[in-house]
Amino acid sequence: MARADIFKEQNSMKKYHKKMGFAMTTILTSAMFFVGCGAETGDTTDTGEAVELTILAAASLTDVCNEIKTEYEAAHPNVTLNFSYGASGALQTQIEEGAPADLFFSAATKQMKALDEEGLMDSDSIVKLLENKVVLIVPEGSDKDITSFEDVATDKVGMIGLGEPGSVPVGQYSEEIFTSLGIWDTVKTKANYGSDVRTVLSWVETGAVDCGVVYATDAYVGENIQIVCEAPAGSCKQVIYPVGIVKASEHADAAAEFLAYLQTDHAMQKFEGYGFSAAE
């Protein structure tokens, strides 16, 4: 089955999945995780020392990371995970300005690379963990007959929601896509720019815009929206999510334990449940 079809099927079944909560899979995998967690990442828990980790994470990771937080804290009672979500560019700026952070989980390699080149990341810890896709969405029941990214340049679209290209990775990818199609100059005159991808999603959910460009994973958890299509092949860079330890972290060992957990098969099952895939 083509990936676009997979996400369309997921979009139509998401309310059922939310009700069921992937119940049997969660029960079985969680039981396995709790049995084995002490052997895998027991250092911080064994010492009894309370640790709070601050993780700056892209807004598109909100739902899955909130689930991971609940489970990880239950298995590691002395560890508190404090997630701060936002646009990757804004989070990059926070780290550059000295905001306390232990890990950075970006929605693009650009921001991670910049911080690493500035000497603000532990280079050896950086992992390209996840891959996402960029999709065009419309409000559920839209009568605009929008069927492609090319349609955004036509009279079918009066306003489109996009991430701010200067700070929001999905906005950068959007600009790349429309530029590759030769219609960016027209599209940008119709654009309403959001501070992060979830803002764009909310605009489409409420019908404030005719369409929007978001990640497939955001569309998967969205309400009252329809996926039109994925970005044309080769129209933008591969959407990779890197994660790494901030060099100024005061809890490097605990951060390394959590980073190791994010790379386990159990954690990847969580990410895949929200539409992400492992980066290749």
Predicted features by range, described:
Residues 1-52, 271, 275, 279-280:
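Short, low-complexity disordered leader/linker segments with a strong preference
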Residues 101-106:
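Periplasmic-binding protein-like
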Residues 118-126:
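A short, gly/pro- and small-residue-rich
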Residues 126-134:
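Short, glycine-/small- and polar/acidic-enriched structural segments
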